[in-house]
Amino acid sequence: ARDGYISQPENCVYHCFPGSSGCDTLCKEKGGTGGHCGYKEGRGLACWCLELPDNVGIIVDGIKCHT
């Protein structure tokens, strides 16, 4: 397990609003212990998760979001 900005399949962040419970819910649904809305340089507001399982993608630096 590891902490990180949870990633959608195309290496895109899950955008969020500071103070909302959306990230905590998303992270727990994906098997993490929780999360919050953080700021990822170059990506903007993004969900940060704690203790995500290794099979859940996190943002890889240097690879652009490609939808």
UniProtKB/Swiss-Prot annotation:
The keyword Transmembrane helix does not apply. Pfam families: Toxin_3 (PF00537). Keywords: Amidation, Disulfide bond, Ion channel impairing toxin, Neurotoxin, Secreted, Toxin, Voltage-gated sodium channel impairing toxin. It is found in: Secreted. Its main location: secreted. InterPro entries: LCN-type_CS_alpha_beta_dom, Scorpion_toxin-like, Scorpion_toxin-like_sf, Scorpion_toxinL, Scorpion_toxinL/defensin. Expressed by the venom gland. Alpha toxins bind voltage-independently at site-3 of sodium channels (Nav) and inhibit the inactivation of the activated channels, thereby blocking neuronal transmission. Is highly toxic to insects (tested on the crickets A.domesticus). This peptide may also be toxic to mammals, since it is similar to alpha-like toxins that are active on both insect and mammalian sodium channels. Has the structural arrangement of an alpha-helix connected to antiparallel beta-sheets by disulfide bonds (CS-alpha/beta). Belongs to the long (4 C-C) scorpion toxin superfamily. Sodium channel inhibitor family. Alpha subfamily. This is Toxin Bl-1. It comes from Buthacus leptochelys.
